[in-house]
Amino acid sequence: MNSEKQSRQWAHGADMVVGQLEAQGVKQVFGI
């Protein structure tokens, strides 16, 4: 397995999740 590629995919997914949370205004809840 190419762990480097897997890590990049995970990081990209995390960025998408954070973007969605921010779009929903959840970032205020977490105080980010």
Swiss-Prot record:
Swiss-Prot/TrEMBL catalytic activity: 2 pyruvate + H(+) = (2S)-2-acetolactate + CO2
Entry keyword set: Transferase
Molecular function in Gene Ontology: acetolactate synthase activity
Region forming the signal peptide: none
Pathway: Polyol metabolism; (R,R)-butane-2,3-diol biosynthesis; (R,R)-butane-2,3-diol from pyruvate: step 1/3
Family in the record: Belongs to the TPP enzyme family.
Self-association state and partner proteins as the record states: Homodimer.
Note: Does not seem to require thiamine pyrophosphate.
Protein's UniProt name: Acetolactate synthase, catabolic
Species of the source: Klebsiella aerogenes (Enterobacter aerogenes)
Phylogenetic lineage: Bacteria, Pseudomonadati, Pseudomonadota, Gammaproteobacteria, Enterobacterales
